[in-house]
Amino acid sequence: MDNYVLNLLQLCDSTFPTGAFSHSFGLETYIQDGIIFNKETFSKWNKAYIKEQLVYSDGLACRLAYEALENNDMDTIWMLDGMLRAQILARESREGSRIIGERLLTLGNQLYPSSRLTSYVDRIAKGVSYGHPAIAFALISHSLSIPKNTTVMSYLFSSNANLVQNAVRGIPLGQTQGQQLIKESQDFIADAWNLIETLTEDDFGITASGIEISQMRHEVLHIRIFMS
């Protein structure tokens, strides 16, 4: 068995304490608007989120970050960190990504310490960098010698699984339905990974305006169970 497998399983475990369970990234707005109310309506939204948001932001950034690490190009890592920060227009989602990224990075550096992870932690502490889970995941995975393709696919899977679990609580859905959604989304995640492999840096940030607007509107909802 490859040595990295158990580390990767821990990194992608839903109990890994990044705080992702507190963020819906606009999903809760659609729930309160009555657009998402069951398994089928969430599945439709989730496919759009993966294809229109996750692919062109986090997913692509994770791949580009890993490739930069292969070339020992830390300047590109810091540039991607800034691009991800600027690309998230909604304040809550921007802050949510920062918090999740910082927690993933801090815990990752405690479990799998490396000079690059420490450098990222230090830059965030100094306010030079912001922190983002896609960058942190790439850094940790590269330090553990997890292959690039496995890294990007795992990041997509983990991000999707977290959103599904939040849908289970927010809509709400049954736990069995949640697992069905995760299983049913696997082919779509594989398609998303294939698409990411064809993209360039010029494709970064092509995201759906409807999802971004729902993320902006979330902070003025009267009742909320999620932070974004």
Curated annotation (Swiss-Prot):
**In Gene Ontology terms, what is one molecular function of this protein?**
nickel cation binding
Q: Does the keyword Cytoplasm apply?
A: yes
Location in the cell: Cytoplasm
Q: Which UniProt keywords apply?
A: Chaperone, Cytoplasm, Nickel insertion
Q: What's the superkingdom here?
A: Bacteria
Q: InterPro entries from the entry?
A: UreF (IPR002639), UreF_sf (IPR038277)
**Is Plastid included in the keywords of this UniProt record?**
no
Residues passing through the membrane, by range: none
> What is one term from the GO cellular component aspect held by the record?
cytoplasm
Q: Which Pfam families match?
A: UreF (PF01730)
Record note on quaternary structure: UreD, UreF and UreG form a complex that acts as a GTP-hydrolysis-dependent molecular chaperone, activating the urease apoprotein by helping to assemble the nickel containing metallocenter of UreC. The UreE protein probably delivers the nickel.
Physiological role = Required for maturation of urease via the functional incorporation of the urease nickel metallocenter.
Query: What family does this belong to?
Result: Belongs to the UreF family.
- This one is known as Urease accessory protein UreF
The scientific name of the source species is Lachnoclostridium phytofermentans (strain ATCC 700394 / DSM 18823 / ISDg)
